[in-house]
Each structure stands twice: as C-alpha cells, then as structure tokens.
Amino acid sequence: MTNTCTPNHKSSYTYEDLLASGRGELFGPKGPQLPAPTMLMMDRVIEMNETGGQYGKGYVEAELDIKPDLFFFGCHFIGDPVMPGCLGLDAMWQLVGFYLGWIGGEGKGRALGVGEVKFTGQVLPTAKKVTYRIHLKRVINRKLIMGVADGEVEVDGRVIYTATDLKVGLFQDTSTF
C-alpha cells in the first residue's frame, strides 16, 4: 500500500477523533475522511482490529447515541419519526472506509455497492443506542484499494439491518468517477 503517513492504529476512537478524520487530520492529508456532522453517523468507534470479525480479516464496532432531536426525526416522517434506513447503510460504508484509512490506505473514499440489505426493524426517537458491526471479508490492494465487508446495525441490543458485500474504494482522483 502506498502510504506516506503512519497509520493511526488505536483500537478505539472518540467523537473528537472522528471529527479529526472529517478534517483530514487523523490519517494524514491523503487518508480517507469521514463526513462531518450531520452526516457523521457514529459517536465513537469502540473496537477495531485486523484479525477479528466473522472472517478473521478485520472488525469494526461503533456506536451512535440516539437523541430525539437528531435532525432526521424532525422530517422523516412528520408525526411518525424514524431514522432513515439509508443512514444506517451509509454508516456501514463510512466504517469500511474508516477501516481502510486505519490500515494505511490513501485516497478519497467512495461507496461502490452492496450485495444485499435487509431491514427488519427501525430506529425510533425512544431508542438509546445504535451499534454498528463490520466484518471485513477482504481488502484488495492494487491500483484501487477496496474493502469488502458484511455489516449489521443493532438498536438497543436487537439486530435490525444486515448488509452483505459492502464495498468501499479509495480513489486518488475522483474527477472522472
């Protein structure tokens, strides 16, 4: 992997660390960035490793504290507030990209697809915590750096979304993407 920065190999990250990632400060100027609030879909990363998960190829676990005043509850839907499922899916893509930066990958992260997504529950404003779990299946390190993972979203201890083959790539140039 062409890497001009030292990977930031902590096993957990605070909200301030995640904000630093969004500013391009955590993994260096060429490392992938997380989005800034309000699109940052996690408050902390509580575990990261290169050998864990269902496939033994990497694991990420992160959390989002649910507060009734989160932006989406006021508009999705009026009188029937629920977190959009696409935001949970985006959080999983965010975490795959974060993992690629954590192992030293460089470039701008882009979601490239997902095999299958299932929604079997919802996040309501009465919930307390969302937990995301990412199980890396493989990392491709060629001209394009790409992570492939399975993921799940849990609310208050119950799995409500699952996704297979989440794909995120790191691109040196996104002008023709």
From Swiss-Prot:
The keyword Signal does not apply. It comes from the Bacteria. InterPro entries: FabA, FabA_FabZ, HotDog_dom_sf. GO terms for biological process: unsaturated fatty acid biosynthetic process. One of its GO terms (cellular component) is cytoplasm. It is found in: Cytoplasm. The active site is at 76. The keyword Lipid biosynthesis applies. Coiled coil: none annotated. It catalyses: a (3R)-hydroxyacyl-[ACP] = a (2E)-enoyl-[ACP] + H2O; (3R)-hydroxydecanoyl-[ACP] = (2E)-decenoyl-[ACP] + H2O; (2E)-decenoyl-[ACP] = (3Z)-decenoyl-[ACP]. One of its GO terms (molecular function) is (3R)-hydroxyacyl-[acyl-carrier-protein] dehydratase activity. SUPFAM superfamilies: Thioesterase/thiol ester dehydrase-isomerase. Its EC number is 4.2.1.59, 5.3.3.14. Pathway: Lipid metabolism; fatty acid biosynthesis. Keywords: Cytoplasm, Fatty acid biosynthesis, Fatty acid metabolism, Isomerase, Lipid biosynthesis, Lipid metabolism, Lyase. Necessary for the introduction of cis unsaturation into fatty acids. Catalyzes the dehydration of (3R)-3-hydroxydecanoyl-ACP to E-(2)-decenoyl-ACP and then its isomerization to Z-(3)-decenoyl-ACP. Can catalyze the dehydratase reaction for beta-hydroxyacyl-ACPs with saturated chain lengths up to 16:0, being most active on intermediate chain length. Homodimer. Belongs to the thioester dehydratase family. FabA subfamily. This is 3-hydroxydecanoyl-[acyl-carrier-protein] dehydratase. It comes from Actinobacillus succinogenes (strain ATCC 55618 / DSM 22257 / CCUG 43843 / 130Z). The gene is fabA.
